[in-house]
Amino acid sequence: MGTVGKKKDRPAHGCSTIPKLALELKQIIHSTTHPKVPAVTPLRVMMPLGKLSKGASLDELIQMCIQAFDLDGNMGQNNELLQIMLTMHGFLIPSTELLIKLRTLYQDAMQNRSFSFCLRICYFIRYWITELWVMFKMDAKLTQTMEEFQELVRSHGEELHWRLIDTAQINSRDWSRKLTQRIQSNCSKKRKVSLLFDHLEPQELAEHLTYLEFKAFRRISFSDYQNYIVNGCVKDNPTMERSIALCNGISQWVQLMVLSRPTPQLRAEVLTKFIHVAQKLHQLQNFNTLMAVIGGLCHSSISRLKDTSSHVSHDVTKVLNEMTELLSSCRNYDNYRRAYNECTNFKIPILGVHLKDLIALHEAMPDFLEESKINVPKLHSLYNHINELIQLQNIAPPLEANMDLVHLLTLSLDLYYTEDEMYELSYAREPRNYRAPPVTPSKPPVVADWASGVSPKPDPKTISKHVQRMVDSVFKNYDLDQDGYISQEEFEKIAASFPFSFCVMDKDREGLISRQEITAYFMRASSICSKLGLGFLHNFQETTYLRPTFCDNCAGFLWGVIKQGYRCKDCGMNCHKQCKELVVFECKKRSKCSMGENNTLSDAGQLEVIPAGGKGLTNDCLGADEGPYSYPNGDGDIHTEVSKDRTIMLMGSSAQKISVRLQPAVKHRATQTENETQSLCLQVPSPPRSRTPDLTSHLPISPMPSPCPSPVPTRKKAYAKWENKDSIRKARAELRGGKAGIQELEKEKVFLKEENTALKIQLKDAHRRVETLRAELRKYVLDSDTHQKGS
């Protein structure tokens, strides 16, 4: 690649954005040209502001916009002023109030019989509707005010004016702005499309990531940029939030795909592949996705993998260093700005860098000048910066997208992990070596701060849509005989393309996977990885119910005499056989459990290596040896959903599954006097044990030093102490007295209510049976009497 962005004829950028903005402001005010001003974007042809450089009132700006139209509706020389006023007025006044001002001017002009001025107002509004019709689609109050304006115009009998401001044309617009109108899916390839990560070329992967990035980028409107500048965050800004979530999702996906490989050699292969993907992204001039990929590769959870790095060639490492230097934040992203300004045609900027520039410009320049006049040069400068980002949306990328691969990537990028969880996975692969000097965790040097901490969670409807599209693509490419099944081998290869993998599924046919089974598989996987609450997989077991029971998933009745359905032994959830693979509710393990259900327990933070090739595995992913978690002192209510332990499953190319159980990030109050427990350990699961309770399993496990403690110094693990239920109740009674007694009574009350409800159902069923028997008895007696009389 060579040295990136080293031009001697360009002045070096400063470390701050403010001096640059001051130079640009000076250029606007004095209407002079400054050679090679280090602006955020290439120099634009500035509109000479003239007297507007000293500011103007809002009414004066409105009058100038109206007078820009002649009686035939043609515009004069203030075309850019119209654009600035209509796009940037949100900094000054809401759109509804601007329309109300125009309506007031129209009423006054009608009273003064100034019909030419009324006509110009209508031309101005028509221009607003034509150029910025999205505002009327997204703002309900603005639409309502426009309807009131139309009624006012009709009441005066001005049919021509009414037609000019008619908003019916908006409904015919394709306002959804679908990307497929500009980038057609690749239908020319007749070969079988591979959906496997190992078979994808870096060029192909980079193109489809660019497709997704451009799709999110081009949906950001003027108002979205304005809202971010004013609020400084993405709250109530869904399009901006989706763009940031995609960037974070790609960064985490890169890390997880590396960590999903079991050996350093395989991890080095994935690492090398993503570096080549970064090269292709640079060639496509997609800097935003390039930032996400390099940020993932430079993350501490990846950079600490010394064994993995030792298998990466020197040339590949050199390319990574060059990319990191290109995206470095030194000198206010000087290298990136030079490379970006030299690019022509299609390009996707690093959105976070340009948003920071916009905020700096907004903060550096006042909104008003002397005599409460609007700072028009500030609006003009903000408009030029935002408008360049908007204009980039009109340039289609030079690529062809395969929608099947797009659907697979869309689903695999729905990932939301915390920093601690990423470190847990990293330490599971390469535990800390105490002989080597400790690696100080640090943030990646290229990740923009604006994107950190933004993880909008998709709703179940969105996840279901992504899963359904991906499953349709899988069966279109792999179900050649169209019988609704794919082979077990093909399914395992597809599942290995994701940075997560869960349990071995039940198959309707030997060696075949149905559409329903693969849909249920990815629904459960996506629900867990997107943190929708499914923190634990259910431990379903076939059960015979002795009382009427309903399915907790579909609310249907569990029919049958024996083995009517399945019951989770951890949380008690009941469901049909056909519903147990479709459950997307979290398995909330109960603190109360019988002695027979508690076998040998794992330490907090324990990691289990589970071979996936065995045929004896069932749908129980956590194994029969893992018991429910309980808080000895009844403090489970203080642990929020964020601090709940969570299971992450990974599967590498060798079909070996790793289950990393993540524990709460704070130490439990009941164990403040205990030593810190083991953080992570490797254990091969033992053969299934008998259900006879083992007394040794209830003894406290001796604490062991952690072989790979968390990189966060203050982070400690919870220690679970398992005791008999009676002893727990006695301890609570001694420590809490009356309060514990009240809590126990409330729990008993809830339990009795449940029992009472079940007994009522049984009683009603018994009454129905009695009535049925009575009816049959009466019928039998009547038939007997009739027979006797006949004889």
Curated annotation (Swiss-Prot):
It comes from the Eukaryota. Residues 466-501, 502-528 form the EF-hand domain. The keyword Transcription does not apply. PROSITE patterns: EF_HAND_1, EF_HAND_2, RASGEF_CAT, RASGEF_NTER, ZF_DAG_PE_1, ZF_DAG_PE_2. Regulated by F-actin polymerization and probably by calcium. A zinc finger (Phorbol-ester/DAG-type) spans 537-587. Residues 728-783 form a coiled coil. Ca(2+) 1 binds at residues 479, 481, 483, 485, 490. InterPro entries: C1-like_sf (IPR046349), DAG/PE-bd (IPR020454), EF-hand-dom_pair (IPR011992), EF_Hand_1_Ca_BS (IPR018247), EF_hand_dom (IPR002048), PE/DAG-bd (IPR002219), Ras-like_GEF (IPR008937), Ras-like_Gua-exchang_fac_N (IPR000651). Keywords: Calcium, Cell membrane, Coiled coil, Cytoplasm, Differentiation, Endoplasmic reticulum, Golgi apparatus, Guanine-nucleotide releasing factor, Membrane, Metal-binding, Repeat, Zinc, Zinc-finger. Residues 201-432 form the Ras-GEF domain. Residues 53-106 are annotated as: Ras exchanger motif region. GO terms for biological process: cell differentiation; Ras protein signal transduction. Functions as a diacylglycerol (DAG)-regulated nucleotide exchange factor specifically activating Ras through the exchange of bound GDP for GTP. Belongs to the RASGRP family. This is RAS guanyl-releasing protein 1. The gene is rasgrp1.
